[in-house]
Amino acid sequence: MHNQAPIQRRKSTRIYVGNVPIGDGAPIAVQSMTNTRTTDVEATVNQIKALERVGADIVRVSVPTMDAAEAFKLIKQQVNVPLVADIHFDYRIALKVAEYGVDCLRINPGNIGNEERIRMVVDCARDKNIPIRIGVNAGSLEKDLQEKYGEPTPQALLESAMRHVDHLDRLNFDQFKVSVKASDVFLAVESYRLLAKQIDQPLHLGITEAGGARSGAVKSAIGLGLLLSEGIGDTLRVSLAADPVEEIKVGFDILKSLRIRSRGINFIACPTCSRQEFDVIGTVNALEQRLEDIITSMDVSIIGCVVNGPGEALVSTLGVTGGNKKSGLYEDGVRKDRLDNNDMIDQLEARIRAKASQLDEARRIDVQQVEK
Protein backbone atom coordinates (compact mmCIF):
# COMPACT_ATOMS: atom_id res chain seq x y z
CA MET A 1 0.00 0.00 0.00
CA HIS A 2 3.04 2.25 0.15
CA ASN A 3 3.83 4.48 -2.82
CA GLN A 4 6.90 4.02 -4.97
CA ALA A 5 10.07 5.68 -3.75
CA PRO A 6 10.67 9.29 -4.85
CA ILE A 7 14.01 8.37 -6.42
CA GLN A 8 15.06 9.99 -9.69
CA ARG A 9 17.07 7.36 -11.50
CA ARG A 10 20.18 8.24 -13.47
CA LYS A 11 19.56 8.29 -17.20
CA SER A 12 21.43 5.59 -19.07
CA THR A 13 21.43 3.88 -22.42
CA ARG A 14 19.50 0.65 -23.01
CA ILE A 15 21.03 -2.76 -23.61
CA TYR A 16 19.52 -6.23 -23.47
CA VAL A 17 20.89 -9.29 -21.69
CA GLY A 18 18.87 -11.97 -23.41
CA ASN A 19 15.31 -10.72 -23.11
CA VAL A 20 16.02 -8.61 -20.02
CA PRO A 21 16.18 -4.85 -20.65
CA ILE A 22 18.94 -3.04 -18.78
CA GLY A 23 19.12 0.73 -18.30
CA ASP A 24 16.99 3.59 -19.62
CA GLY A 25 14.43 3.21 -16.84
CA ALA A 26 14.07 -0.58 -17.03
CA PRO A 27 13.46 -2.38 -13.72
CA ILE A 28 16.70 -2.93 -11.83
CA ALA A 29 17.74 -6.51 -12.59
CA VAL A 30 18.83 -8.79 -9.75
CA GLN A 31 21.47 -11.37 -10.53
CA SER A 32 23.69 -13.94 -8.89
CA MET A 33 26.53 -16.26 -9.87
CA THR A 34 26.80 -20.02 -9.70
CA ASN A 35 29.40 -21.51 -7.37
CA THR A 36 29.35 -25.05 -8.72
CA ARG A 37 32.01 -26.50 -10.98
CA THR A 38 30.78 -25.43 -14.39
CA THR A 39 31.90 -28.77 -15.81
CA ASP A 40 29.39 -30.42 -13.46
CA VAL A 41 26.49 -29.70 -15.77
CA GLU A 42 23.78 -31.27 -13.63
CA ALA A 43 24.78 -29.41 -10.46
CA THR A 44 25.10 -26.11 -12.31
CA VAL A 45 21.74 -26.47 -14.05
CA ASN A 46 20.07 -27.34 -10.75
CA GLN A 47 21.56 -24.28 -9.09
CA ILE A 48 20.51 -21.99 -11.93
CA LYS A 49 16.96 -23.34 -11.75
CA ALA A 50 16.94 -22.73 -7.99
CA LEU A 51 17.98 -19.14 -8.68
CA GLU A 52 15.23 -18.81 -11.28
CA ARG A 53 12.65 -19.97 -8.75
CA VAL A 54 13.49 -17.15 -6.35
CA GLY A 55 13.38 -14.53 -9.09
CA ALA A 56 16.88 -14.18 -10.55
CA ASP A 57 16.72 -12.07 -13.69
CA ILE A 58 20.25 -12.96 -14.84
CA VAL A 59 22.78 -15.59 -13.76
CA ARG A 60 26.54 -15.40 -14.24
CA VAL A 61 28.57 -18.55 -14.82
CA SER A 62 32.35 -18.78 -14.61
CA VAL A 63 33.90 -20.29 -17.74
CA PRO A 64 37.62 -20.72 -16.97
CA THR A 65 38.50 -23.45 -19.49
CA MET A 66 37.49 -24.86 -22.85
CA ASP A 67 36.00 -27.86 -21.03
CA ALA A 68 33.85 -25.41 -19.09
CA ALA A 69 32.86 -23.76 -22.38
CA GLU A 70 31.64 -27.11 -23.71
CA ALA A 71 29.71 -27.63 -20.48
CA PHE A 72 28.25 -24.13 -20.84
CA LYS A 73 26.72 -25.19 -24.16
CA LEU A 74 24.81 -27.99 -22.42
CA ILE A 75 23.83 -25.77 -19.51
CA LYS A 76 22.47 -23.07 -21.79
CA GLN A 77 20.19 -25.58 -23.48
CA GLN A 78 18.52 -26.51 -20.18
CA VAL A 79 17.71 -23.15 -18.58
CA ASN A 80 15.55 -20.15 -19.43
CA VAL A 81 17.19 -17.31 -17.52
CA PRO A 82 19.79 -15.25 -19.45
CA LEU A 83 23.37 -16.34 -18.76
CA VAL A 84 26.48 -14.20 -18.47
CA ALA A 85 29.78 -15.97 -19.11
CA ASP A 86 32.59 -14.81 -16.83
CA ILE A 87 35.78 -14.86 -18.92
CA HIS A 88 39.36 -14.12 -17.92
CA PHE A 89 42.72 -14.48 -19.67
CA ASP A 90 41.74 -16.61 -22.70
CA TYR A 91 39.89 -14.72 -25.44
CA ARG A 92 39.18 -18.00 -27.26
CA ILE A 93 36.78 -19.02 -24.51
CA ALA A 94 34.75 -15.87 -25.13
CA LEU A 95 34.55 -16.68 -28.83
CA LYS A 96 33.48 -20.24 -28.06
CA VAL A 97 30.63 -19.39 -25.66
CA ALA A 98 29.45 -16.76 -28.14
CA GLU A 99 28.87 -19.65 -30.56
CA TYR A 100 26.83 -21.39 -27.87
CA GLY A 101 24.34 -18.57 -27.35
CA VAL A 102 25.71 -16.70 -24.34
CA ASP A 103 23.59 -13.68 -23.45
CA CYS A 104 26.40 -11.46 -22.14
CA LEU A 105 30.18 -11.59 -21.82
CA ARG A 106 31.81 -10.41 -18.62
CA ILE A 107 35.41 -9.57 -19.46
CA ASN A 108 38.25 -7.46 -18.18
CA PRO A 109 39.93 -6.05 -21.29
CA GLY A 110 43.09 -5.66 -19.24
CA ASN A 111 43.63 -9.42 -18.93
CA ILE A 112 41.94 -10.81 -22.02
CA GLY A 113 44.97 -10.32 -24.27
CA ASN A 114 46.47 -7.88 -26.73
CA GLU A 115 44.68 -5.32 -28.89
CA GLU A 116 43.96 -7.79 -31.67
CA ARG A 117 42.42 -10.33 -29.31
CA ILE A 118 40.19 -7.73 -27.72
CA ARG A 119 39.08 -6.61 -31.18
CA MET A 120 38.22 -10.21 -32.09
CA VAL A 121 36.04 -10.58 -28.99
CA VAL A 122 34.31 -7.24 -29.60
CA ASP A 123 33.72 -7.98 -33.28
CA CYS A 124 32.21 -11.34 -32.35
CA ALA A 125 29.97 -9.71 -29.74
CA ARG A 126 28.83 -7.11 -32.28
CA ASP A 127 28.09 -9.72 -34.95
CA LYS A 128 26.03 -11.83 -32.55
CA ASN A 129 24.41 -8.87 -30.73
CA ILE A 130 25.94 -9.87 -27.39
CA PRO A 131 26.51 -7.15 -24.79
CA ILE A 132 29.66 -6.97 -22.69
CA ARG A 133 30.15 -6.16 -19.04
CA ILE A 134 33.40 -4.45 -18.18
CA GLY A 135 34.25 -5.64 -14.69
CA VAL A 136 36.75 -3.53 -12.74
CA ASN A 137 37.70 -4.82 -9.30
CA ALA A 138 39.82 -3.16 -6.61
CA GLY A 139 41.56 -6.47 -6.03
CA SER A 140 42.84 -6.79 -9.59
CA LEU A 141 43.79 -3.29 -10.69
CA GLU A 142 46.39 -2.98 -13.42
CA LYS A 143 49.97 -2.87 -12.13
CA ASP A 144 50.64 0.64 -13.45
CA LEU A 145 47.58 1.98 -11.63
CA GLN A 146 48.65 0.29 -8.41
CA GLU A 147 52.04 1.98 -8.74
CA LYS A 148 50.50 5.33 -9.65
CA TYR A 149 48.01 5.49 -6.77
CA GLY A 150 49.76 3.28 -4.21
CA GLU A 151 46.51 1.54 -3.30
CA PRO A 152 43.01 1.15 -4.68
CA THR A 153 41.28 4.54 -4.66
CA PRO A 154 38.09 5.79 -6.32
CA GLN A 155 40.21 7.64 -8.85
CA ALA A 156 42.19 4.47 -9.61
CA LEU A 157 39.05 2.43 -10.20
CA LEU A 158 37.60 5.21 -12.35
CA GLU A 159 40.76 5.44 -14.45
CA SER A 160 40.77 1.67 -14.96
CA ALA A 161 37.12 1.69 -16.00
CA MET A 162 37.54 4.63 -18.37
CA ARG A 163 40.57 2.99 -19.93
CA HIS A 164 38.41 0.02 -20.87
CA VAL A 165 35.44 2.17 -21.88
CA ASP A 166 37.67 4.18 -24.19
CA HIS A 167 38.95 0.93 -25.66
CA LEU A 168 35.44 -0.17 -26.59
CA ASP A 169 34.64 3.32 -27.89
CA ARG A 170 37.61 3.13 -30.25
CA LEU A 171 36.19 -0.14 -31.54
CA ASN A 172 32.81 1.57 -32.05
CA PHE A 173 31.07 -0.76 -29.58
CA ASP A 174 28.50 0.71 -27.21
CA GLN A 175 26.51 -2.31 -26.04
CA PHE A 176 28.08 -2.65 -22.63
CA LYS A 177 27.61 -2.04 -18.93
CA VAL A 178 30.29 -1.34 -16.34
CA SER A 179 31.02 -2.25 -12.74
CA VAL A 180 33.67 -0.86 -10.36
CA LYS A 181 33.54 -3.17 -7.36
CA ALA A 182 35.44 -3.11 -4.09
CA SER A 183 35.04 -4.89 -0.77
CA ASP A 184 35.24 -1.56 1.05
CA VAL A 185 31.83 0.10 1.04
CA PHE A 186 33.00 3.70 0.79
CA LEU A 187 35.58 2.91 -1.89
CA ALA A 188 32.94 1.20 -4.02
CA VAL A 189 30.31 3.89 -3.49
CA GLU A 190 32.60 6.78 -4.37
CA SER A 191 33.94 4.92 -7.42
CA TYR A 192 30.42 4.40 -8.76
CA ARG A 193 29.54 8.03 -8.10
CA LEU A 194 32.51 9.20 -10.13
CA LEU A 195 31.81 6.75 -12.95
CA ALA A 196 28.13 7.70 -13.12
CA LYS A 197 29.17 11.25 -14.02
CA GLN A 198 31.51 10.09 -16.79
CA ILE A 199 29.50 7.67 -18.91
CA ASP A 200 25.93 7.03 -20.06
CA GLN A 201 26.11 3.24 -20.12
CA PRO A 202 24.24 1.13 -17.55
CA LEU A 203 26.01 0.38 -14.28
CA HIS A 204 26.11 -3.01 -12.57
CA LEU A 205 26.33 -2.58 -8.79
CA GLY A 206 28.07 -4.76 -6.27
CA ILE A 207 30.17 -4.78 -3.12
CA THR A 208 32.61 -7.52 -4.04
CA GLU A 209 33.65 -10.21 -1.56
CA ALA A 210 31.28 -8.64 0.93
CA GLY A 211 31.51 -11.49 3.44
CA GLY A 212 29.27 -14.17 4.91
CA ALA A 213 25.50 -14.26 4.85
CA ARG A 214 25.01 -11.77 7.70
CA SER A 215 27.95 -9.38 7.37
CA GLY A 216 27.83 -9.47 3.57
CA ALA A 217 24.14 -8.64 3.53
CA VAL A 218 24.75 -5.66 5.83
CA LYS A 219 27.65 -4.34 3.73
CA SER A 220 25.68 -4.75 0.54
CA ALA A 221 22.57 -3.12 1.97
CA ILE A 222 24.57 -0.08 3.02
CA GLY A 223 26.65 0.25 -0.15
CA LEU A 224 24.00 -0.61 -2.70
CA GLY A 225 21.36 1.24 -0.71
CA LEU A 226 23.37 4.46 -0.81
CA LEU A 227 23.85 4.24 -4.57
CA LEU A 228 20.30 3.16 -5.37
CA SER A 229 18.87 5.95 -3.23
CA GLU A 230 20.85 8.38 -5.41
CA GLY A 231 19.40 6.84 -8.57
CA ILE A 232 22.61 5.03 -9.52
CA GLY A 233 22.44 1.43 -10.71
CA ASP A 234 20.74 -0.66 -13.38
CA THR A 235 21.62 -4.19 -12.29
CA LEU A 236 22.94 -5.54 -9.00
CA ARG A 237 24.47 -8.53 -7.33
CA VAL A 238 24.77 -9.11 -3.60
CA SER A 239 28.03 -11.06 -3.24
CA LEU A 240 27.86 -13.45 -0.29
CA ALA A 241 29.95 -16.36 0.90
CA ALA A 242 26.70 -18.31 1.10
CA ASP A 243 24.14 -20.12 -1.03
CA PRO A 244 23.64 -17.97 -4.17
CA VAL A 245 19.89 -18.21 -3.61
CA GLU A 246 20.39 -15.96 -0.59
CA GLU A 247 21.99 -13.34 -2.85
CA ILE A 248 18.78 -13.03 -4.84
CA LYS A 249 16.63 -12.82 -1.72
CA VAL A 250 18.79 -10.09 -0.18
CA GLY A 251 18.92 -8.23 -3.49
CA PHE A 252 15.14 -8.06 -3.71
CA ASP A 253 14.92 -7.16 -0.01
CA ILE A 254 17.17 -4.15 -0.66
CA LEU A 255 15.01 -3.03 -3.59
CA LYS A 256 11.83 -3.59 -1.58
CA SER A 257 13.20 -1.58 1.34
CA LEU A 258 13.83 1.35 -0.99
CA ARG A 259 10.45 0.84 -2.68
CA ILE A 260 12.20 0.60 -6.04
CA ARG A 261 11.04 -2.87 -7.07
CA SER A 262 8.90 -5.37 -5.22
CA ARG A 263 8.69 -9.10 -5.60
CA GLY A 264 6.82 -11.16 -3.07
CA ILE A 265 5.82 -10.27 0.45
CA ASN A 266 7.31 -7.42 2.42
CA PHE A 267 6.96 -8.54 6.03
CA ILE A 268 6.75 -5.84 8.69
CA ALA A 269 7.24 -7.36 12.13
CA CYS A 270 7.96 -6.07 15.61
CA PRO A 271 11.11 -7.21 17.46
CA THR A 272 8.79 -8.41 20.28
CA CYS A 273 8.64 -7.63 23.98
CA SER A 274 6.68 -8.87 26.97
CA ARG A 275 3.48 -7.36 25.52
CA GLN A 276 3.32 -9.81 22.59
CA GLU A 277 0.16 -11.90 22.60
CA PHE A 278 1.42 -14.60 20.21
CA ASP A 279 4.76 -15.92 18.95
CA VAL A 280 5.67 -13.18 16.48
CA ILE A 281 9.19 -14.41 15.73
CA GLY A 282 8.10 -17.99 15.10
CA THR A 283 5.20 -16.81 12.96
CA VAL A 284 7.34 -14.56 10.77
CA ASN A 285 10.08 -17.16 10.31
CA ALA A 286 7.58 -19.85 9.37
CA LEU A 287 5.66 -17.65 6.95
CA GLU A 288 8.81 -16.40 5.23
CA GLN A 289 9.72 -20.01 4.47
CA ARG A 290 6.24 -21.18 3.54
CA LEU A 291 5.45 -18.24 1.27
CA GLU A 292 8.65 -18.01 -0.77
CA ASP A 293 6.66 -19.08 -3.82
CA ILE A 294 4.45 -15.97 -3.65
CA ILE A 295 5.67 -13.33 -6.11
CA THR A 296 2.71 -10.96 -5.67
CA SER A 297 3.82 -7.64 -4.22
CA MET A 298 2.14 -7.02 -0.87
CA ASP A 299 2.89 -5.67 2.61
CA VAL A 300 2.04 -7.90 5.57
CA SER A 301 2.42 -6.52 9.10
CA ILE A 302 2.71 -8.91 12.03
CA ILE A 303 2.68 -7.01 15.30
CA GLY A 304 2.36 -8.68 18.70
CA CYS A 305 0.27 -6.09 20.55
CA VAL A 306 -2.03 -3.10 20.15
CA VAL A 307 0.61 -0.40 20.70
CA ASN A 308 1.80 -0.17 17.09
CA GLY A 309 -0.23 -2.95 15.50
CA PRO A 310 -3.29 -0.97 14.36
CA GLY A 311 -1.16 1.81 12.87
CA GLU A 312 0.95 -0.60 10.85
CA ALA A 313 -2.15 -2.52 9.76
CA LEU A 314 -3.68 0.65 8.35
CA VAL A 315 -0.94 0.88 5.70
CA SER A 316 -0.55 -2.85 5.03
CA THR A 317 -2.24 -5.14 2.56
CA LEU A 318 -2.85 -7.52 5.45
CA GLY A 319 -2.06 -6.85 9.10
CA VAL A 320 -2.27 -8.73 12.38
CA THR A 321 -2.48 -6.96 15.73
CA GLY A 322 -1.93 -9.10 18.81
CA GLY A 323 -4.82 -9.48 21.23
CA ASN A 324 -5.78 -11.67 24.19
CA LYS A 325 -6.30 -15.22 22.84
CA LYS A 326 -7.37 -13.82 19.48
CA SER A 327 -5.66 -11.20 17.30
CA GLY A 328 -7.20 -8.68 14.96
CA LEU A 329 -6.84 -9.21 11.21
CA TYR A 330 -6.89 -6.14 8.98
CA GLU A 331 -7.25 -6.12 5.20
CA ASP A 332 -6.37 -2.96 3.29
CA GLY A 333 -6.51 -1.02 6.54
CA VAL A 334 -9.95 -2.28 7.63
CA ARG A 335 -10.45 -4.70 10.52
CA LYS A 336 -12.06 -7.83 9.10
CA ASP A 337 -11.72 -10.75 11.50
CA ARG A 338 -10.01 -12.25 14.54
CA LEU A 339 -7.49 -15.08 14.37
CA ASP A 340 -6.86 -17.71 17.05
CA ASN A 341 -3.40 -17.07 18.52
CA ASN A 342 -2.75 -20.80 18.87
CA ASP A 343 -3.25 -21.40 15.15
CA MET A 344 -1.82 -18.16 13.83
CA ILE A 345 0.62 -19.52 11.23
CA ASP A 346 -1.81 -21.74 9.31
CA GLN A 347 -4.63 -19.19 9.41
CA LEU A 348 -2.44 -16.32 8.28
CA GLU A 349 -0.84 -18.35 5.51
CA ALA A 350 -4.28 -19.16 4.13
CA ARG A 351 -5.37 -15.51 4.26
CA ILE A 352 -2.17 -14.31 2.58
CA ARG A 353 -2.47 -16.85 -0.23
CA ALA A 354 -6.09 -15.92 -0.79
CA LYS A 355 -5.23 -12.23 -0.92
CA ALA A 356 -2.36 -12.86 -3.33
CA SER A 357 -4.72 -14.76 -5.65
CA GLN A 358 -7.25 -11.93 -5.44
CA LEU A 359 -4.60 -9.32 -6.31
CA ASP A 360 -3.26 -11.42 -9.17
CA GLU A 361 -6.74 -11.81 -10.65
CA ALA A 362 -7.43 -8.08 -10.36
CA ARG A 363 -4.18 -7.26 -12.14
CA ARG A 364 -4.95 -9.83 -14.85
CA ILE A 365 -8.30 -8.17 -15.50
CA ASP A 366 -6.67 -4.73 -15.58
CA VAL A 367 -4.16 -5.92 -18.17
CA GLN A 368 -6.92 -7.41 -20.32
CA GLN A 369 -8.87 -4.15 -20.21
CA VAL A 370 -5.80 -2.15 -21.21
CA GLU A 371 -5.10 -4.51 -24.11
CA LYS A 372 -8.66 -4.04 -25.39
Swiss-Prot record:
<keyword id="KW-0414">Isoprene biosynthesis</keyword>
<dbReference type="InterPro" id="IPR045854">
    <property type="entry name" value="NO2/SO3_Rdtase_4Fe4S_sf"/>
</dbReference>
<dbReference type="InterPro" id="IPR016425">
    <property type="entry name" value="IspG_bac"/>
</dbReference>
<dbReference type="GO" id="GO:0046429">
    <property type="term" value="F:4-hydroxy-3-methylbut-2-en-1-yl diphosphate synthase activity (ferredoxin)"/>
</dbReference>
<dbReference type="InterPro" id="IPR011005">
    <property type="entry name" value="Dihydropteroate_synth-like_sf"/>
</dbReference>
<keyword id="KW-0479">Metal-binding</keyword>
<keyword id="KW-0004">4Fe-4S</keyword>
<dbReference type="GO" id="GO:0051539">
    <property type="term" value="F:4 iron, 4 sulfur cluster binding"/>
</dbReference>
<dbReference type="GO" id="GO:0141197">
    <property type="term" value="F:4-hydroxy-3-methylbut-2-enyl-diphosphate synthase activity (flavodoxin)"/>
</dbReference>
<keyword id="KW-0411">Iron-sulfur</keyword>
<dbReference type="GO" id="GO:0016114">
    <property type="term" value="P:terpenoid biosynthetic process"/>
</dbReference>
<comment type="function">
    <text>Converts 2C-methyl-D-erythritol 2,4-cyclodiphosphate (ME-2,4cPP) into 1-hydroxy-2-methyl-2-(E)-butenyl 4-diphosphate.</text>
</comment>
<dbReference type="InterPro" id="IPR004588">
    <property type="entry name" value="IspG_bac-typ"/>
</dbReference>
<keyword id="KW-0408">Iron</keyword>
<protein>
    <recommendedName>
        <fullName>4-hydroxy-3-methylbut-2-en-1-yl diphosphate synthase (flavodoxin)</fullName>
        <ecNumber>1.17.7.3</ecNumber>
    </recommendedName>
</protein>
<dbReference type="GO" id="GO:0019288">
    <property type="term" value="P:isopentenyl diphosphate biosynthetic process, methylerythritol 4-phosphate pathway"/>
</dbReference>
<feature type="binding site">
    <location>
        <position position="312"/>
    </location>
    <ligand>
        <name>[4Fe-4S] cluster</name>
    </ligand>
</feature>
<feature type="binding site">
    <location>
        <position position="270"/>
    </location>
    <ligand>
        <name>[4Fe-4S] cluster</name>
    </ligand>
</feature>
<comment type="pathway">
    <text>Isoprenoid biosynthesis; isopentenyl diphosphate biosynthesis via DXP pathway; isopentenyl diphosphate from 1-deoxy-D-xylulose 5-phosphate: step 5/6.</text>
</comment>
<feature type="binding site">
    <location>
        <position position="305"/>
    </location>
    <ligand>
        <name>[4Fe-4S] cluster</name>
    </ligand>
</feature>
<comment type="similarity">
    <text>Belongs to the IspG family.</text>
</comment>
<dbReference type="Pfam" id="PF04551">
    <property type="entry name" value="GcpE"/>
</dbReference>
<feature type="binding site">
    <location>
        <position position="273"/>
    </location>
    <ligand>
        <name>[4Fe-4S] cluster</name>
    </ligand>
</feature>
<dbReference type="GO" id="GO:0005506">
    <property type="term" value="F:iron ion binding"/>
</dbReference>
<keyword id="KW-0560">Oxidoreductase</keyword>
